[in-house]
């Protein structure tokens, strides 16, 4: 194992940037991530590593993840020696999932939740806040992420834009907030954000997410999914919200 670690570290060291993002589609035991973290220690770099693998014979959960968790936290090796952890690193674990093809509230909500995780990875921003400018965030309407260095606002309901723009207008910010809007159209919404154009950076949804969202978004002419068909659309409140009757005070808090 040591020889493979050294080889991968040498290969990674050939890259010019100490802020590279390394993608390994054949993660195996996680040697690439281990080597990345070790190389960062050696040269003060800030490389990031994404591992992708299946979980055949539980290798991802029991080997790949466990190995790198221990590398970060510290561990005792086979000789009984204490190995100091590479504690300036962190590790996140995601599982893929399937979203049904049928147009329904359930599939739409599942997609936006999963897609938001992907946006967090894209922006390298994971710290979710439960308020935005004094307004509580609400599940299914908008979510807000802020790690003290950058901010991201993800809007699921177009009807919320005007109120959120009013909130942004009154904010004193040092850099633009990245804004994503889930919408059946590719409208970037510049017009709606004109008054706060200096405070936001409107971001297009990745094309794959946008295409999937359009495919499963219930059409307005479709009958509202009934509770027995959709476990997440169980109340009149849900159906009212879906039909455009936005009400911040009634929607379930995130």
Question: Could you say what each language-model-derived stretch is?
Answer:
Residues 20-39:
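A phosphate-binding catalytic loop at a beta-strand-loop-alpha-helix junction
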Residues 1, 5-21, 41-254:
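Accessory, often C-terminal, charged low-complexity segments
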